[in-house]
């Protein structure tokens, strides 16, 4: 599904007339221990003529270029001299020497696509489609944040066994910390009363955190270290049960 999503985004962006960036510096390092982790694209320099429309088209070209780099499994990008530790991405998992400042790339791409859709609307349609103006609210409130392996400590793998999540991953230049981008139901506000918009006369509702599998460096109860798929919190959904006797 991830490859399909990236392919659709590339097709969408390729239809736009984008002005190439004058200079794009990308830093990163391929991971020998875990091929599934890809390098982070870092846009260091943006320069060019002062055109009101150039920023949007240049950004589209940049995203297309970054996606192509992420999809190229054979390419190994050498780290720059200024950054000895490369930040490595894999969906909701990241290896970095410091706490990530932004959500994973796929989340940013989704927000960017929504921005492009809004930019193509007229001002009147844009105001009408604004969720805040229509009074739209999510059924369940959720929170997302980066957590470290030190905070997770243990997790459940695909075989149902409990494994220990390693806090640091060895790399040629030292060690990097494992970070996980988790999404869970908010414990504040309306969530305690059930889901929004549900008729309580007929339905019992509850906001529940669901999990998905991501790959991480772990050790099992026999002290065997390896990359395994583990479960982390990835979404907040509304579950319904019909009230009896109605």
UniProtKB/Swiss-Prot annotation:
Domain of life per record: Eukaryota
Keyword Glycoprotein applies: yes
InterPro entries reported in the protein's UniProt record: Brain-der_neurotrophic_factor, Cystine-knot_cytokine, Nerve_growth_factor-like, Nerve_growth_factor-rel, Nerve_growth_factor_CS
The keyword Membrane appears for this protein: no
Bridged cysteine pairs (disulfide): 140-207, 185-236, 195-238
Gene Ontology terms describing biological process: cell surface receptor protein tyrosine kinase signaling pathway; modulation of chemical synaptic transmission; negative regulation of neuron apoptotic process; nerve development; nerve growth factor signaling pathway; neuron projection morphogenesis
GO MF, one example: nerve growth factor receptor binding
Keyword list, A-Z: Cleavage on pair of basic residues, Disulfide bond, Glycoprotein, Growth factor, Secreted, Signal
Assigned GO CC terms: axon; dendrite; extracellular space; synaptic vesicle
Signal peptide: 1-18
Gene3D superfamilies xrefs: Cystine-knot cytokines (2.10.90.10)
Main location: secreted
Record's subcellular location: Secreted
Record-linked PROSITE patterns: NGF_1, NGF_2
Glycosylation sites: 120
UniProt propeptide residues: 19-127
Main function: Promotes the survival of neuronal populations that are all located either in the central nervous system or directly connected to it.
Family: Belongs to the NGF-beta family.
PANTHER family: BRAIN-DERIVED NEUROTROPHIC FACTOR, NERVE GROWTH FACTOR NGF -RELATED
UniProt name for this protein: Neurotrophic factor BDNF precursor form
Source species of the chain: Ptyas major (Chinese green snake)
Native organism taxonomy: Eukaryota, Metazoa, Chordata, Craniata, Vertebrata
């Amino acid at each position: 599904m991830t490859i399909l999503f990236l392919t659709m985004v590339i097709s969408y962006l390729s239809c736009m007339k984008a002005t190439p960036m004058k200079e794009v510096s990308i830093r990163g390092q391929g991971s020998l221990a875990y091929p599934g982790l890809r390098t982070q694209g870092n846009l260091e320099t943006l320069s060019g003529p002062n055109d009101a429309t150039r920023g949007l088209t240049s950004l589209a070209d940049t995203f297309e270029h970054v996606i192509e780099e992420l999809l190229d499994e054979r390419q190994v990008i050498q780290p720059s001299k200024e950054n000895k530790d490369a930040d490595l991405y894999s969906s909701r998992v990241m290896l970095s020497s410091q706490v990530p400042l932004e959500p994973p790339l796929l989340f940013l791409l989704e927000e960017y696509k929504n921005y492009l859709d809004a930019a193509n609307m007229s001002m009147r349609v844009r105001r009408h489609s604004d969720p805040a103006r229509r009074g739209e609210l999510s059924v369940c409130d959720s929170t997302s944040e980066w957590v470290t392996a030190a905070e997770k400590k243990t997790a459940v793998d695909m075989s149902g066994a409990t494994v220990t999540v390693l806090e640091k991953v060895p790399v040629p230049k030292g060690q990097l910390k494992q970070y996980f981008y988790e999404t869970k139901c908010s414990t504040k506000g309306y969530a305690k009363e059930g889901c929004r918009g549900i008729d309580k006369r007929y339905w019992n509702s509850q906001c529940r955190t669901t999990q998905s599998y991501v790959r991480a460096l772990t050790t099992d109860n026999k002290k065997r270290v390896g990359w395994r798929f583990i479960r982390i919190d990835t979404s907040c959904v509304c579950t319904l049960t019909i009230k009896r006797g109605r």
